[in-house]
Amino acid sequence: ASDVWSVTSFNELSRDGQHVERWNHLHPDDKPRKAYVTQMLEERKGPVVSSTDYIKLHSEQLRAFIPKTFMTLGTDGFGRSDTRQKLRSFFEVDRYYVTVTALAALARDGDIAEEVVLEAMRKYGIDRNKPNPVLS
């Protein structure tokens, strides 16, 4: 099973986390506060995968506040595709890469066998030796 969450603003979640960190630094004698995104995810099972049509760094700004294995996917470039579907495929953020990334995170955490990831890659035709789209 999995949960799908929609983030309306990575920036606002990041600001909240930074505000909480500042408050905790300035109030060492009080009970530490937790960022909103931390509160929402800390009791959830499994890794967190972020997939966005923006650059990876957009969601990476939440890494400090995600209390789980956190994998980010993003379109680190532009002008490479004539449709959104092709863009997502080229930059490895389409549904197949989201699935394989989630499975890879589960394998990394020891929750599933690595063979499950390899089988999904075969099923979806993912070439793991394809050049990194950011560098191509």
Predicted features and spans:
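Thiamine diphosphate
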Residues: A1-S136
